[in-house]
């Protein structure tokens, strides 16, 4: 990192030049950015983006906006990049309403809610990244999604510069998606400034729905448990799968699950189930979905020949986690191209075997599958 200082154009936000982005992402890949503007308040975020977006209309490059860097793959050749980093991290609680600024560490939000006796977020414990990223792709795990509890989101409209609250109903949440999700990470039309959650003040968790978690708690489906006990069970399950970031463990340097679980028609599921029975491959893990049948992407990946730790060559800079076949991990020296190359191989291999195309979950900046 070279020069740093405070930017008067950006309401006092901190500006640093020549900043390596790899340490700011959970995958630990990325270029050296031309400058990073770190905003510790919503006012700084709005001021910075209004100025930079106005400049972009006259030919300047649009900035990349992120906070925790947990869902990004950024190409190393983007050396002229300007980054607006969200570090506005306030968390406020009013009764059963929890409001988290975009840069708040999401797991800190979960902890604060549980400490206040509020249920609803405990199944999402240990998910890396910021609160502001959660509504964008409707983050979920262990039978829960943030759409279960989000009431509204405060947004900056980058086209008009307007700041407004938008109700959950208008966010059109779906499986790992919302109206906020955009394929081009450099052309995102809105930026989340704050998220509001309405939680259960009863002191009990949301109803348990996920079989593995239910078994770990020795509970029954639909039971409401102690939120802290649920959190501890979830963290233990995530740790066993390498899904809790550990800076000393390359097996956790990832974006989490790289591919979403595909939703297929009933006919496609029945074909796969029949083929699996013929091969004596065991039952096909599946779950009901509003528009079909949701399959377990990890099962497809492993049955297509990509086992945990693939490729086995110890020198491979990017490999599947040894604990979870959906996590593509940086073994210490991987580039974005290494990650994308492995992702392509896995995606194409699954398609060749099953005729199903897996879709990536992270945002790809300057690279594509």
Curated annotation (Swiss-Prot):
It comes from the Bacteria. It catalyses: UDP-N-acetyl-alpha-D-muramate + NADP(+) = UDP-N-acetyl-3-O-(1-carboxyvinyl)-alpha-D-glucosamine + NADPH + H(+). InterPro entries: FAD-bd_PCMH (IPR016166), FAD-bd_PCMH-like_sf (IPR036318), FAD-bd_PCMH_sub1 (IPR016167), FAD-bd_PCMH_sub2 (IPR016169), MurB (IPR003170), MurB_C (IPR011601), MurB_C_sf (IPR036635), Oxid_FAD_bind_N (IPR006094). Its cofactor is FAD. Residues 29-202 form the FAD-binding PCMH-type domain. Keywords: Cell cycle, Cell division, Cell shape, Cell wall biogenesis/degradation, Cytoplasm, FAD, Flavoprotein, NADP, Oxidoreductase, Peptidoglycan synthesis. Transmembrane segments: none annotated. This is UDP-N-acetylenolpyruvoylglucosamine reductase. It comes from Mycobacterium tuberculosis (strain ATCC 25618 / H37Rv). The lineage of its organism: Bacteria, Bacillati, Actinomycetota, Actinomycetes, Mycobacteriales.
């Amino acid at each position: 990192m070279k020069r740093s200082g405070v930017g008067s154009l950006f309401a006092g936000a901190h500006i640093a030049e020549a900043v390596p982005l790899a340490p700011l992402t959970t995958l630990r890949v990325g270029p050296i950015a031309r400058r990073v503007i770190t905003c510790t308040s919503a006012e700084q975020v709005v001021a910075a983006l209004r100025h930079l977006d106005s400049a972009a209309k006259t030919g300047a490059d649009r900035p990349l906006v992120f906070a925790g860097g947990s869902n990004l793959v950024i190409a190393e050749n983007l050396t002229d990049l300007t980054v607006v980093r969200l570090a506005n991290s306030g968390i406020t609680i009013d009764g059963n309403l929890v409001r988290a600024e975009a840069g708040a560490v999401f797991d800190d939000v979960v902890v604060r809610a549980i400490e206040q006796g509020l249920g609803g977020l405990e199944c999402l414990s240990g998910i890396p990244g910021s609160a502001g990223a959660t509504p964008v792709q409707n983050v979920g795990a262990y039978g829960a999604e943030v759409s279960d509890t989000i009431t509204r989101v405060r947004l900056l409209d980058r086209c008009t510069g307007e700041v407004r609250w938008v109700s959950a109903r208008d966010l059109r949440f779906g499986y790992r998606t919302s109206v906020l999700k955009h394929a081009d990470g450099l052309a995102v039309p809105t930026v989340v400034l704050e998220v509001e959650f309405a939680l259960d003040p009863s002191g009990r968790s949301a109803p348990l729905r996920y079989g593995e978690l239910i078994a770990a708690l020795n509970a029954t489906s639909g039971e409401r448990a102690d939120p802290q006990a649920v959190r501890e069970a979830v963290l233990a399950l995530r740790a066993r799968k390498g899904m809790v970031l550990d800076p000393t463990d390359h097996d956790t340097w990832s974006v989490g699950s790289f591919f979403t679980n595909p939703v297929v028609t009933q006919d496609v599921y029945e074909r796969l189930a029949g083929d699996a029975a013929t091969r004596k491959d065991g039952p096909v893990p599946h779950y009901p979905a509003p528009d079909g049948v949701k399959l377990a992407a990890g099962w497809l990946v492993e049955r297509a020949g990509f086992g945990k730790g693939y490729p086995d060559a110890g020198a491979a800079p990017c490999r599947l986690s040894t604990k979870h076949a959906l996590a593509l991990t940086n073994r210490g020296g991987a580039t974005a191209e290494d990650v994308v190359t492995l992702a392509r191989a896995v995606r194409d291999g699954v398609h060749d075997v099953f005729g199903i195309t897996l879709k990536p979950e992270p945002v790809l900046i300057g690279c594509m599958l």
